[in-house]
Amino acid sequence: MVDCQKEACNLQSCIQRNQYNQGNCEKFVNDLLLCCKRWYDKNSLTGNEAPHTCPELKPLLRQLSSRNLT
């Protein structure tokens, strides 16, 4: 499976189950953000394009910081 696609699908399923209330799915948001961070940590120097499921690095780092996940 494509990098972080599992986490993105889990988040989407949770949001749909909860009538699009993301507040009930924070664990899945965090899982996706942490997966994306791991991807950047592993691939940032390779020149690979980030997975379409992940934000760009700077916004990702801001989101991680605001959630105290750094």
UniProtKB/Swiss-Prot annotation:
For this protein, the record's InterPro entries field holds: CMC4, Cys_alpha_HP_mot_SF
Q: Where is this motif: Cx9C motif 2?
A: 25-35
Q: Where is this motif: Cx9C motif 1?
A: 4-14
Q: Which residues form the CHCH domain?
A: 1-43
- Listed as disulfide-bonded, the cysteine pairs are C4-C35, C14-C25
Q: Which UniProt keywords apply?
A: Disulfide bond, Mitochondrion, Repeat
An example GO CC term for this entry is: mitochondrial intermembrane space
**First-listed, main subcellular location of the protein, grouped into a coarse class:** mitochondrion
A Pfam family name for this chain? CMC4
Q: What induces it?
A: Differentially expressed during meiosis.
Compartments reported by the entry: Mitochondrion intermembrane space
Cite the PANTHER family for this sequence.
Answer: CX9C MOTIF-CONTAINING PROTEIN 4
Can you tell me which family this protein belongs to? Belongs to the CMC4 family.
What's noted about domains in the record? The twin Cx9C motifs are involved in the recognition by the mitochondrial mia40-erv1 disulfide relay system and the subsequent transfer of disulfide bonds by dithiol/disulfide exchange reactions to the newly imported protein.
Protein's name according to its UniProt entry: Cx9C motif-containing protein 4, mitochondrial
Native organism: Schizosaccharomyces pombe (strain 972 / ATCC 24843) (Fission yeast)
